[in-house]
Each structure stands twice: as C-alpha cells, then as structure tokens.
Amino acid sequence: IENQGKNTPLIFTAVTDPEAAGLTNCDFITGTNDMNPVADQVALIHDVNPNAKKMGVLYSSNEVNSQVQCDLAIEKAKTMGMSTSTQTITSVNDITNAVNALVSDGCDAIYLPTDNVIATAVATVTNITNDLGIIVICGEEGMIGDGGLVSYSINYKALGVMTGEMGVQVLNGTKAGDIEITGLPVAELSLVINKKAAAAANITV
C-alpha cells in the first residue's frame, strides 16, 4: 500500500478487520468490511431451540480473527442466559476430539466462526452433532453448504455493489478518506438454512 502512493485512491472490499489490516485513518483509502454479524448469528440458537442452555465455540487458535469472533459470541450468549464452552484447534486433525469435548460438556449448540481451518472440515463437526441433535450455527454461507445448519451471512454480491458505489463517488471527486469504511446493514444479510442438515439432526427450523 505504501508503494502505491498517496495520489492514487485505494478502495478495498471484503476485509474483515480493516483497522487490524492498517487500512483506517488514511486519506486515500476507503472500502467495505465483511465482518460477520456474530451477535445476530448467535441469536439464531434460541430461534431454533428456545430451551438451549449452553453454547460451544470451536475455532483455530492460530487465527486472531476467530478469537475476536469467539469473544463476541460469548458476550452475546451471556446476554441470552446461556453458559459457554470453548475448544481451540491447530489443525483439522484436532476437530473430532474438540467437538466431542464440547458434546461432553453439555453444549446444546456449537458456533463455528469464519475460520479457515474449520471451514475445510465442517462435515467432521456435523458427523458428530447431527446424531445428537446439536445446533450448528456458522459464520458464513459456505459453511452451511458443507453441512452447517443456519447462518446470517454476508451477501458478497451486495457488498461488491456497495464497494463499486464508493468507487463512483471517488471518480466523481469525493476524497476516498472522506468516505466511511462500512459493511452491509443487517437488513441486507442473507438468512441461510440447510434443510438437509436440519432433517439429519431432526431439528425443526
């Protein structure tokens, strides 16, 4: 970015944490973030099962963004009167033991954040949880396609349109740094349900 030069506006898209990426407070940079709505996603647990008492969170200890999502998920769960349990992994080889630990700890639901390691092995999670009727809430739509139950997910097409509109503003003379870095409002998120997963887990959604 420094080599880009400050005379050329830079517009980014789908950056989860622009501040951590060093993209904020620059007068030639703006764009959109794709931070998933963790609180809204966790709230889905009681939409599916109002009697759920304990939420587990499974994530990779190597991914800082996953820790951020874990903290947000726990914070929301507490406001819902749920207790929580967490398990971290370093590779897909750890997932089975980690999920079994959450099950043994009495979790009614498991939250999977947007996590690169977890995303490659969602089926490993649901192969255990489906037989037990445990709710699996996911951080993004792709994980639903791989076996997760439900998510509020970023609509990346809509996010791209929003980013493009920022580009138009810049082309029309607005300084990039004067355009607020933002993401999609909740109203434009997609509620994604995996009915096949619901049937496999004998869950009504």
Regions found by a protein language model. Give the residues of each.
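Flexible loop/hinge segments that line or gate small-molecule binding clefts
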Residues: 4-38, 139-150
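Short, well-structured alpha-helical segments in soluble
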Residues: 96-106
